[in-house]
Swiss-Prot record:
Family listed: Belongs to the TMCO4 family.
Swiss-Prot/TrEMBL keywords: Membrane, Transmembrane, Transmembrane helix
Chief location of this protein within or outside the cell: membrane
Subcellular location as annotated: Membrane
Region (Disordered), start-end ranges: 1-49
Region forming the signal peptide: none
SUPFAM superfamilies, sorted: alpha/beta-Hydrolases (SSF53474)
Transmembrane segments: 219-239, 262-282, 427-447
Pfam family, any one: DUF726
Organism from which the protein derives: Caenorhabditis elegans
Name of this chain's protein: Uncharacterized membrane protein F35D11.3
GO cellular component: membrane
Length: 617
């Protein structure tokens, strides 16, 4: 019979303040979290849920769930030309059928649908069959999904494709995604609140491996990380399994019985990244290329089975150094565990100052009119721009070109960090605007060249990206992203066009228009022209932009979201000129973004951009 897990309330442990750390200018990993700070007594911690009550599903329900999951795998993940996707689908199918405890004959029948030997069945009767089950009527579909979650995590690698797969299932089974996130967060808190210690056997194996491979330096890095005295390298913890005391008692039995073992605790420690020294445990002894500053800092103190990393595009002159990479993201609530990348702050500060200086020359009515006509025509030729603007262009060109080059190198370095799994073997979402989006884009391009890159990145959100709009390059990015790749653009971003004025007329910038996504179901284009009044608005109105593309943001006052159209000074010209552009183009272009019809292959998409919470993920 099938056993699934039912979430029920449990207890929590005490919390204490985390010791303050100074930022590490050249660190290579996520900050190590103090276990005590992740207690559920904190305001951001989830309610505890024990995953232990066995639930028995009817045979018809189990068969329907098997067919439903097989259909999702076949339509959304199977690719005949990609061996990795085929392997993922088959291994996931095996986990699901094992969880459902199906007879071998039934498994063989359902598997023919997965492999394309038989036509897929209609999903509507499957969903109706599930809803008729007594368990569904009393508990909903969450017990089954929670059981799958535990089974996936117990593999020691919460692959980002697992999470996207579960997201698709929650949509079909009518489970609110935030409720499922509560289950994830509860499991994460339960695991991280334990006191992890290294077993004697693990220590012996680790030390022997270290001697053989001459990686004593990595052991010292592990000591600096300070995770209960565990000395490990950059692998995220595979070389040093951990033992969680009383894990079996606190996690419970039933569907999670496998997690109560020493091995289960070890792989979960690896999944969460708690077995690793974290990003701050490693300090680069020398520069990587031209990079002078690279570190990942904590943005929020929660814990989760997934995390987010944000990358800013520049630093504004009125921002303090400590808040330079934090303030813009202060309302972000995408996941409970969020990080921000600090990189090349001196150069990004110079760029911010240069942009503000250039904008001060765009105040006159004459220049506004010229910018209006130039942007409307979509011109990038140097001869089309005002002489007054061109006369000071060198002030911006030099810092921009320096930052563009360094952003690409930072992206390559970020790829190495993510491939090292310092954040743990769990999904991570990347969000960036302007040059931050460029960092992420080059990170993904670098990862696309590596075979071990699949299953790490869940979603990617690029806003005002100063990168090519070539479908060929974006298709490479899609190969390493399990979920969505969002391109947020502004058609009237004259500053971005101005910065690329020396490029050929055939060159298209992603931040100024949609990406051709006819051959990719992962790419989503969002026209943000009705929110963004200029390139600098990606920083000033970031909360509104994030809300528009479906990223969760926290409560905020109207004063905290700046309306640039009401500001005086350098930003005024941008707002007035581009409001005129929007007004003149109302009859010719759609105000809303390009969208696709919702189907099973793209069940995580939303049509209406102006309904901020419909596309949350």
């Amino acid at each position: 019979m099938s056993k699934c897990a039912t979430p029920t309330p449990s207890t929590s442990s005490n919390s204490s303040d985390e010791a303050k750390r100074s930022p590490q200018p050249m660190s290579r990993g996520f900050p190590q979290r103090n276990m005590s700070t992740t207690s559920s007594n904190g305001s951001n911690s989830p309610r505890h849920r024990s995953l232990e009550t066995p639930i028995v599903l009817q045979p018809a329900t189990r068969f329907a769930l098997a067919n439903l999951t097989t259909t999702v795998l076949r339509l959304d993940f199977w690719d005949d030309n990609d061996p990795n996707s085929i392997f993922f689908c088959k291994s996931t199918f095996n986990i699901v059928t094992q969880c459902l405890d199906l007879p071998e004959k039934v498994i063989k029948t359902v598997k023919t649908h997965l492999e394309g030997e038989e036509d897929l069945t209609d999903i509507a009767p499957m969903i109706m069959s599930v809803r008729e089950d007594p368990v569904y009527k009393t508990e909903g579909s969450t017990p089954f999904l929670a059981s799958l979650l535990v089974a996936f995590v117990n593999q020691g690698n919460y692959d980002s494709r697992y999470r996207v797969f579960l997201r698709h299932l929650t949509t079909l089974l009518g489970v609110v995604w935030t409720e499922f996130e509560d289950v994830e967060d509860s499991l994460a808190s339960t695991l991280l609140e334990e006191q992890f210690v290294e077993s004697e056997h693990s220590r012996t194996v680790r030390e022997k491996t270290a001697r053989n491979k001459k990686i004593k330096r990595y052991l010292m890095i592990g000591a600096a990380g300070g995770v209960g005295g565990v000395l490990i390298g950059l692998t995220g913890g595979l070389a040093a399994p951990l033992v969680a005391a009383s894990a079996g008692m606190l996690i419970g039995g039933g569907a999670v019985a496998g997690l109560a073992t020493t091995a289960g605790a070890a792989v979960l420690g690896t999944t969460m990244g708690v077995a690793g020294a974290g990003f701050t445990g490693y300090k680069m002894k020398k520069r990587v290329g031209a990079i002078e500053e690279f570190s990942v800092e904590t943005l929020s103190e929660g814990v989760s089975l997934s995390c987010s990393l944000v990358v800013s595009g520049w630093i504004e002159s009125d921002t303090s150094p400590d808040q330079a990479f934090v303030h813009q993201w202060r309302h972000l609530r995408h996941t409970k565990e969020q990080y921000t990348l600090r990189y090349e702050s001196n150069y990004l500060m110079e760029l911010g100052n240069a942009i503000e200086y250039l904008m001060s020359f765009a105040v006159s009515v004459a220049i506004q009119q010229t910018l209006l006509e130039t942007a409307l025509a979509g011109l990038v030729s140097a001869v089309a721009w005002p002489v007054a603007l061109m006369s000071v262009s060198s002030v911006l060109d030099n810092p921009w070109n320096v930052c563009v080059s360094r952003a690409a190198e930072v992206g390559e370095q970020l790829a190495e960090v993510l491939l090292s799994r310092s954040h743990g073997k769990r999904p991570i979402t990347l969000i960036g605007f302007s040059l931050g989006a460029r960092v992420i884009f080059h990170c993904l391009l670098t990862m696309s060249k590596r075979s071990e890159s699949v299953g790490i990145i869940e979603d990617v959100i690029l806003l005002g990206a100063p990168v090519t709009a070539s479908p060929k390059e974006w298709s490479k990015v899609c190969t390493v992203v399990s979920g969505r790749v969002i391109n947020g653009y502004c058609e009237t971003d004259w500053l971005l066009r101005f910065l690329y004025r020396t490029m050929s007329a055939q060159f298209r910038i992603a931040g100024t228009g949609p990406i051709d996504n006819r051959n990719s179901k992962k790419i989503y284009n969002y026209n943000l022209s009705h929110i963004v009044k200029g390139h600098m608005d990606y920083s000033k109105r970031l909360t509104e932009v994030l809300n528009a593309v479906g990223v969760k943001v926290g409560p905020h006052s109207e004063d905290s979201v700046v309306d640039l159209t009401q500001l005086e000074g350098p930003h005024e010209a941008t707002g007035q000129a581009e409001e005129a552009i929007n007004y003149q183009s109302t009859g010719e272009e759609e105000e809303h973004p390009i969208v696709h019809p919702i189907n099973l292959e793209n069940i995580h998409e939303v049509k209406v951009l102006d309904s901020p919470h419909k596309n949350e993920f």
